[in-house]
Design a protein with these regions (language model features):
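N-terminal signal peptide c-region/cleavage motif recognized by signal peptidases
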Residues: 3-5
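A low-complexity, Ser/Thr/Gly/Pro-enriched, surface-exposed linker/loop concept
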Residues: 33-72
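Aromatic- and carboxylate-enriched substrate-binding clefts and catalytic-loop regions
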Residues: 115, 255-500
Length: 500
């Protein structure tokens, strides 16, 4: 399926549904969004969510034609494709799952089927998952989340806070925040409420995905250079190494659009980086032993028409030894609020607006002024925040970095990142992680790339050539490398990569 991105950079979303589309029945509320899509809510406190969430950002659609009727026992809502039957006064969810309190009958587009809360869907065509870290053949298939299309003719978006995502995160609400310039996470109206979207599109998969983007947000159009070739390798390259690489690419007439600088750009405690043990996976200051004039090198890259990206592992915060200047500026600005004396650092605290503003002002904007075009968010650490219950670090990093990128003038916003769950299509290109170097891993990636379109995630970028390895004979196997490159030609993001 071809997913067409939106060219518009500013899209006005409104999470409050058209009043004519909303039917309230006691502690239950139903919103008819399209003839094939109904939102089902149930709250014992009758507290319903009208704000955006991590998954859903727009409910202001024209109310479709439908009829509503009821008797002493049931409420009925009927559209051209769906018929909802709700036993009044009951929680639609039952244990075990059963059709006793709520059913939605789907008809049309080649399907006649009945859905009820908790009904399994063995025919779902799958979506994607957070990462291919450690991929060995089919090992990641079981981790793939359900997609929005199914041969059953229906699919479900469970946006309830009580239903954890695959990484343990939850779908928080988003509330306008004038201080940040974009909405910020906040608690849901009722953390125990049911909040489910039922998509009954039959076999009209294209319309299902199109209508999903109407409520979950458009897929932003990536910058043109994203679709060129990316040079990337995990190796402690010096500035002269990069100059030689750029020269070789030109000499061999390999058109290249992006030069990725992996984690050795900063002090990282690696002997190869001559960093005297400073830093680790996380770092913010240039390793001047390798790259003595960072701004000059990035300027050279730009002069040869290379866009630049830097790798980030943010989880360990800002260390006083690795980044003394950034540490001092942020610690002074924040009044020592997030200081961890035992580790000599400022804790990573993107949950909070004051930390986020200081971090972007002092560190990220500084590097962007040097010439960094976009960021590779290589989050591999704890999956949920240690400070905010079930806040997904992957999704929240993606959300914040993309919204901050949108503030830059003259740049179409883009980040390179792992999938953070439904809603991540709004941050349009993905990094699939550290796959194993093997024929089995390569064989799985075309399937994995294609199914991601079933959640609107159309632009996976893989480590072409693989990264991790257990079989040394395959690491530089020319046939395997060639076949991976052939696959890369038809992959949305053409980025070769390798271990050091």
């Amino acid at each position: 399926l071809l997913l067409t991105p939106s060219m518009a950079q500013v899209v006005v979303n409104d999470p409050v549904a058209t009043s004519q589309a909303v039917i309230t029945c006691g502690n239950a509320r139903f919103t008819v969004l399209t003839p094939e899509m109904i939102r089902v809510e149930y709250s014992e406190q009758a507290k319903f969510e009208d704000r955006a969430t991590f998954t859903i950002v727009n409910r202001k659609l024209d109310a479709p034609q439908f009829t509503k009727s009821e008797d002493d026992t049931y409420l009925y809502i009927t559209t051209s494709n769906l018929k909802l039957k709700y036993r009044k006064g009951t929680d639609p969810r039952t244990l075990p799952a059963s059709p006793s309190n709520l059913t939605i009958t789907i008809s049309g587009n080649g399907v006649s089927s009945v859905w009820y809360p908790g009904k399994p869907d063995p025919l779902n065509l799958k979506g994607t998952s957070r990462t291919l870290d450690g991929l060995m053949g089919e090992s990641k298939r079981a981790e793939m989340e359900n997609g929005l299309v199914s041969r059953s003719g229906w699919a479900v978006i469970d946006d309830s806070w009580a239903s954890p995502r695959s990484d343990g995160g939850r779908s928080y609400a988003l509330s306008p925040n004038s201080d940040m310039g974009y909405p910020w996470w906040t608690q849901r109206a009722d953390n125990h409420a049911m909040d489910t979207y039922v998509l009954g599109y039959g076999h009209n998969y294209k319309k299902a995905l199109a209508d999903y983007t109407k409520i979950a947000g458009n897929i932003p159009l990536p910058p043109n250079y994203i679709f060129g070739y990316w040079y990337s390798k995990y190796s402690s390259y010096s500035a002269d190494d990069y100059r030689n690489i750029m020269s070789d690419l030109k000499t061999n007439k390999i058109p290249t659009d992006v030069m990725v600088i992996d984690m050795d750009w900063h002090w990282n405690g690696n002997a190869y980086s001559q960093s005297e043990g400073r830093g680790g996976w996380t770092g913010w200051s240039w390793n001047t032993n390798l790259i003595p004039n960072p701004k000059g090198l990035l300027s050279e890259m730009h002069s040869q028409n290379f866009k630049t990206a830097l790798n980030l592992h943010p989880a360990d915060g800002i260390n006083q030894i690795e980044s003394p200047t950034y540490f001092a500026a942020m610690n002074s600005e924040l009044g020592g609020k997030y200081l961890n004396d035992s580790r000599n650092n400022i804790n990573w605290s993107l949950d909070y607006t004051d930390f986020t503003k200081s971090f972007f002002k002092n560190i990220i904007r500084d590097h962007e002024s040097e010439g960094v075009d976009f960021w590779w968010l290589d989050w591999q650490q704890y999956l949920t925040s240690p400070y905010t219950n079930s806040l997904s670090e992957t999704f929240w990093c993606n959300y914040v970095f993309f919204n901050e990128a949108a503030k830059r003038t003259g740049h179409r916003p883009v980040i390179f990142h792992r999938w953070g769950g439904l809603g991540s299509h709004r941050y349009q290109i993905g990094f699939s992680g550290d796959a194993n170097i093997s024929y089995e891993a390569l064989a799985f990636e075309p399937y994995f790339t294609a199914t991601a379109s079933n959640v609107g995630y159309g632009y996976w970028g893989h480590d072409l050539g693989g990264h991790m390895f257990s079989n040394e004979e395959l690491v530089n196997n020319p046939n395997l490398v060639l076949r991976w490159i052939q696959f890369g030609v038809f992959t949305p993001i053409f980025r070769t990569h390798a271990t050091n």
